[in-house]
């Protein structure tokens, strides 16, 4: 059956174990639309807000990518990994162990060097609060992770790192508007697997560690793995990320977002427009004739829906083009006559200071993205066809 191509946004709650591209592929297949993209990659181990645009709304993605974001994460202190997260190999650092014992003696009564000690969480709370406030809030310089998608002379940093090559990334400015410690758990790990849970007993060879739950609101381009790495480095004990959940991208937030950074009048109805998903497996034969099994992203829709019914259910849960544009950038209500002028590439007599969505409110028509031409006029930089 032929369909008119719709445009809008889906807020996907990405599950763990799949890539952001897997989620895009799931939306593309369910909606039968080729033009689909996302506003900011989430690593496979991460969950949460993935803003996926389809149709003409993909032209809003550049604006959405630049929005600030909120994450909830768990940082493990006491060890390091090769990738600064739970996907890498554990690195047991003798200097870090020694530093842990020094902190143990400072923060506990009778802490003895040479013995694995789980520090009281109350003592850690004060130390972490002071360290974060001094070093990891406001405008800071951050060196991205070696295992990142940043390109160096045309090659991804993670590809170079996997090949064993030296990767040098320059620090870049980022802004941390919130870095709150939510909970602290003290315990021990064997140090063999990065994702192993903390345990209370200290067996022979056990390594003391601390899991710190945090909420971080930050500018676009901030690496939470790098914050975990740098917090551990600042304390001298090592650190890496074991859990990451993105709860907000600009005004697009999951129902469980607790940042409080979206003004009530600016809130979108995310409960209606969030689609959860889960990880499943698919098996296929590759070009070499090998049988391959890998994870895939499956969108959660009511049981029994398929084909057009499933497609329509997802479209009903999507943000419309107008809602998407108003959420992506400042919006300006215009007249139908002004919309026509913009579609012909002409300027309109409006004063604006930043890229703005020009919308005819009566018909919900998103005509264009406009920018300042001069003190009294605005000009179109992106024009959308009349729906």
From Swiss-Prot:
The keyword tRNA processing appears for this protein: yes
Record keywords, A-Z: Isomerase, tRNA processing
InterPro entries: PsdUridine_synth_cat_dom_sf, PsdUridine_synth_N, PUA_sf, tRNA_psdUridine_synth_fam2_C, tRNA_psdUridine_synth_TruB, TruB_C
Any one Gene Ontology BP term: tRNA pseudouridine synthesis
One MF annotation (Gene Ontology) recorded for this entry: tRNA pseudouridine(55) synthase activity
Cysteine disulfide partners in this protein: none
EC number: 5.4.99.25
Catalytic activity: uridine(55) in tRNA = pseudouridine(55) in tRNA
SUPFAM superfamilies membership: Pseudouridine synthase (SSF55120)
Active site positions, chain numbering: 43
KW Isomerase (keyword) present: yes
Function as written in the Swiss-Prot or TrEMBL entry: Responsible for synthesis of pseudouridine from uracil-55 in the psi GC loop of transfer RNAs.
Family per similarity comment: Belongs to the pseudouridine synthase TruB family. Type 1 subfamily.
Name recorded for this polypeptide: tRNA pseudouridine synthase B
UniProt gene name: truB
């Amino acid at each position: 059956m032929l369909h008119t191509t719709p445009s809008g946004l889906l807020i996907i709650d990405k599950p763990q174990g799949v890539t952001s591209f897997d989620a895009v592929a799931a939306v593309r297949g369910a909606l039968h639309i080729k033009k689909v993209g996302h506003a900011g990659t989430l690593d496979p181990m991460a969950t949460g807000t993935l803003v996926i645009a389809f149709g003409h709304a993909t032209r809003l993605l550049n604006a959405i990518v630049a929005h600030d974001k909120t994450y909830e994460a768990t940082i493990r202190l006491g060890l390091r990994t090769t990738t600064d997260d739970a996907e890498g190999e554990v690195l047991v650092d003798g200097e870090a162990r020694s530093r842990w014992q020094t902190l143990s003696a400072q923060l506990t009564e009778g802490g003895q060097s040479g013995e694995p000690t789980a520090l009281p969480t109350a003592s850690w709370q004060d130390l972490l609060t002071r360290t974060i406030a001094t070093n990891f809030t406001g405008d800071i310089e951050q060196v991205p992770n070696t295992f990142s998608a940043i390109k160096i002379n045309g090659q991804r940093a993670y590809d170079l790192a996997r090949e064993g090559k030296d990767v040098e990334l320059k620090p870049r400015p980022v802004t941390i508007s919130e870095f709150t410690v939510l909970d602290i758990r003290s315990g021990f790990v064997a140090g063999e697997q990065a994702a192993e849970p903390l345990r209370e007993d200290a067996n022979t060879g056990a390594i003391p560690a601390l899991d710190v739950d945090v909420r971080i609101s930050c500018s676009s381009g901030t690496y939470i793995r790098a914050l975990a790495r740098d917090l551990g480095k600042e304390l001298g004990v090592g650190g890496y990320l074991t859990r990451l959940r993105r709860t907000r991208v600009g005004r697009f937030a999951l129902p469980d977002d607790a940042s409080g950074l979206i003004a009530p009048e600016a809130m979108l109805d995310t409960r209606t427009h969030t689609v959860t998903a889960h990880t499943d497996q698919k098996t296929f034969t590759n070009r070499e004739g090998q049988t391959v099994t890998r994870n895939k992203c499956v969108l959660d829709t009511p049981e029994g829906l398929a084909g057009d019914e499933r497609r329509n259910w997802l479209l009903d849960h999507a943000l419309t083009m107008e809602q998407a544009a108003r959420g992506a950038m400042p919006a300006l209500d215009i007249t139908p006559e002004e919309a026509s002028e913009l579609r012909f590439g002409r300027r309109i007599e409006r004063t604006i200071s930043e890229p703005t969505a020009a919308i005819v409110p009566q018909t919900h028509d998103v005509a264009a993205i406009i920018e300042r031409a001069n003190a009294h006029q605005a000009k179109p930089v992106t024009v959308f066809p009349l729906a």
